[in-house]
Amino acid sequence: MDLARKEFLRGNGLAAGKMNISIDLDTNYAELVLNVGRVTLGENNRKKMKDCQLRKQQNENVSRAVCALLNSGGGVIKAEVENKGYSYKKDGIGLDLENSFSNMLPFVPNFLDFMQNGNYFHIFVKSWSLETSGPQIATLSSSLYKRDVTSAKVMNASAALEFLKDMEKTGGRAYLRPEFPAKRACVDVQEESNMEALAADFFNRTELGYKEKLTFTESTHVEIKNFSTEKLLQRITEILPQYVSAFANTDGGYLFVGLNEDKEVIGFKAEKSYLTKLEEVTKNSIGKLPVHHFCVEKGTINYLCKFLGVYDKGRLCGYVYALRVERFCCAVFAKKPDSWHVKDNRVKQLTEKEWIQFMVDSEPVCEELPSPASTSSPVSQSYPLREYINFKIQPLRYHLPGLSEKITCAPKTFCRNLFSQHEGLKQLICEEMGSVNKGSLIFSRSWSLDLGLQENHKVLCDALLISQDKPPVLYTFHMVQDEEFKDYSTQTAQTLKQKLAKIGGYTKKVCVMTKIFYLSPEGKTSCQYDLNSQVIYPESYYWTTAQTMKDLEKALSNILPKENQIFLFVCLFRFCLFVCWFVCFFLR
């Protein structure tokens, strides 16, 4: 690997050091590989971990790495097994890790495969599927809260999507709830609005009696807490984000601190200076909450913080912390969404704006894909790949003499010229395709160039094999001896795989193998590198049927720019005109 590029990647990869996630620079896989460091694996082993904080940190590292790869075209997670004698088939992974995967994914086996290789454990991650109309991005936690009767609960991805879609459709909502017509009072009929009204009266009082019984309980609009004075500041700081988010995203409500489980007024003792500090903490905490607006007004979170005096026989003995939060016009987060991707060769957390863009956009957002080549720049597509789109049209197909009719080479003109100039290449292709039952071999002057990467002028050509019963193979042919082409081939294969999923819309598991051949001036050939002999994939990555071949070819055409699609339309139109002219000529 080029030293400058390697140092660049190492610096950026380790920027996620807080999470202990780095990009593996020495992998043989043509994949984006994230290294999560040492991890204890196995259900019993993880249960026995004395350091609960370490177990939680390992879980977060692995989960965030999975999330990042799901949102970045897929890849592989590499973990060094911490505990000696670990066996995947005997010990499993660990229930806490499994639960994290289940909470993130609709069906884990569709996205993840697990494999132990010696002292290393690999998780193969398929790109997030765009088959359904659900969320377009994987998320560990939306960080959007709502009130569910007496609880503040974080919205799952589906609930968050529905909430955000409604907000987008209506352009936000009014701060004040709609007023309903007054109803005739009915004896013994109680509704939740009665509890909210009683809580409002309680909030507006100036004095409370010690051990006074409440006339209301917790509800959608009321939350009651009681903390010891020693941890009061810490606990209020911890709970404010989720309760403010929940009340603001629902219909507003009240938070009271200083009331016990028996619904009695207890209060907490505090000096005036401490109350001032509590007020500042409340202001700062609410002011830091991320919000996203769908409305034009772009207002702020409306709230009122008070301290209600608690009196025992006329003597002030404490205070009740009272917070009223109005319903918000749009969306209030407790913190940034817990959703990750790989961007600029770093594992990064999405901002609320980026995350919402992915969530509410009806069309998938085609973000910049992570690439090992920090210096590569987008360039125009080369002509051979344009022809590939049309290779199914009979005149553009080419069957190499000596090969089965089921093996198609394309594009025709490019292949003929290539084989006529390089007899050794023609013979090599015949040998390589001998074991292929059915497939398409798509040649290009440079697949790297076709994918928007830099061209290596020392490469003679590339060829992509899409065949039945084996993964796609990217062949690289060159005529420069003692030259290193592994990085070029790996980078091209990795980018191809990512674009098939993120832009092409391919929804199944896929890997791209690489094979590099040297062609001597005398026409002799030698294999310099074969990825298939270097790495092992789970069995599910080798299942390639006739249908998956069609899906791959379709995805491949989708990764090309629109001008190439227009080129296809023009070719088809001309072909149809020719057929019509031909038929009319013979019908005269």
Swiss-Prot record:
Question: Which InterPro entries does this chain map to?
Answer: Poxin-SLFN/SLFN_N, Schlafen, Schlafen_AlbA_2_dom, Schlafen_AlbA_2_dom_sf, SLFN_GTPase-like
- Keyword Iron in the entry? The reply is no
Q: What GO cellular component entries does it have?
A: membrane
Q: Which UniProt keywords apply?
A: Membrane, Transmembrane, Transmembrane helix
* Record's bilayer topology term: Single-pass membrane protein
Does the keyword field hold Transmembrane helix? yes
Query: What Pfam families does the record tag this protein with?
Result: B3R, SLFN_AlbA_2, SLFN_GTPase-like
Q: Where are the transmembrane segments?
A: 566-586
Location within or outside the cell: Membrane
Family, per entry: Belongs to the Schlafen family.
* Name of the molecule in the record: Schlafen family member 12-like
Organism the protein comes from: Homo sapiens
Q: What high-level taxonomic lineage is stated for the organism?
A: Eukaryota, Metazoa, Chordata, Craniata, Vertebrata
